[in-house]
């Protein structure tokens, strides 16, 4: 108050270099750096690149079969864990892989990887399921159409391609995500650590769920007669798999 009466000005505050907006001063000291991985236990196979996949199965005659959409429905029971590699492409939904998808993955990954330090392998079989199709302008009837091409059914939770060697996840994550975005179903790049984290997070959500109105409880108790619009798959998978789609947020 006396400064206002006397007309004195307030002292000018000078900002120091230690303010939040300024860069901290350089200080000498010991730095703690992460150890460099040695990859001593990694062995590169004789043929590290992805092998060529046949367009059609090498059998005398393939039997034509119905659609069998259960081939892409629900969770996968095969190729859900790592075998030799440390990084892979994880399918987040069901779908069919055509021969063109195999060629896209093979050419993209083989062009990127260094065969002296990296290797890749398939976790899905070659196309074996026959897809029939009739020509344009044909009338209805006349039996099932001729075989047009072959596909490989994939369920949610299956590994498509594994990559390993003397490399880290940051080096291959970009190319694996690039391949995953071109697949006919949702997919993403994962490592051993991230795959374990996804599984643990799902178990923790189920264990610490605070909402009593879960899909399993509503379907089991047949609340509001919901069982008349549900299928046996909904009771088995607790509503987490809807056809070829996977809904991980549902507990």
Curated annotation (Swiss-Prot):
It holds the Pfam family Ribosomal_L16. GO terms for biological process: mitochondrial translation. Coiled coil: none annotated. Residues 1-29 form a transit peptide. It is found in: Mitochondrion. GO terms for molecular function: rRNA binding; structural constituent of ribosome. Keywords: Mitochondrion, Ribonucleoprotein, Ribosomal protein, Transit peptide. GO terms for cellular component: mitochondrial inner membrane; mitochondrial large ribosomal subunit. Belongs to the universal ribosomal protein uL16 family. Component of the mitochondrial ribosome large subunit (39S) which comprises a 16S rRNA and about 50 distinct proteins. PANTHER family: 50S/60S RIBOSOMAL PROTEIN L16, LARGE RIBOSOMAL SUBUNIT PROTEIN UL16M. This is Large ribosomal subunit protein uL16m. It comes from Bos taurus.
């Amino acid at each position: 108050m006396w400064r206002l009466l006397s007309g004195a000005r307030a002292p000018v505050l000078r900002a120091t270099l230690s303010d939040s907006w300024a860069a901290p001063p350089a200080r000498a000291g010991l730095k703690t750096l992460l150890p460099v991985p040695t990859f001593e236990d990694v062995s590169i196979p004789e043929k590290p690149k992805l092998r060529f996949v046949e367009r059609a199965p090498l059998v005398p005659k393939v039997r034509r079969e119905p659609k069998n959409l259960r081939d892409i429905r629900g969770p996968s029971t095969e190729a859900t864990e790592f075998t030799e590699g440390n990084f892979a492409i994880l399918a987040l939904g069901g779908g069919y892989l055509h021969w063109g998808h195999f060629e896209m993955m093979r050419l993209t990954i083989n062009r990127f990887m260094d065969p002296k330090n990296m290797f890749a392998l398939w976790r899905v079989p070659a196309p074996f399921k026959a897809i029939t199709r009739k020509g344009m302008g044909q009338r209805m009837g006349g039996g099932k159409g001729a075989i047009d091409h072959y596909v490989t059914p994939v369920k949610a939770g299956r590994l498509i391609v594994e990559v390993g060697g003397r490399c880290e996840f940051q080096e291959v994550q970009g190319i694996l995500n690039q391949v995953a975005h071109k697949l006919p179903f949702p997919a993403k790049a994962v490592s051993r650590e991230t795959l374990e984290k996804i599984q643990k997070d799902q178990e923790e959500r189920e264990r610490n769920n605070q909402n009593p109105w879960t899909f399993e409880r509503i379907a089991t108790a047949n609340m509001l007669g919901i069982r008349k619009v549900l299928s046996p798959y909904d009771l088995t998978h607790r509503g987490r798999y809807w056809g070829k789609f996977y809904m991980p947020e549902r507990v």
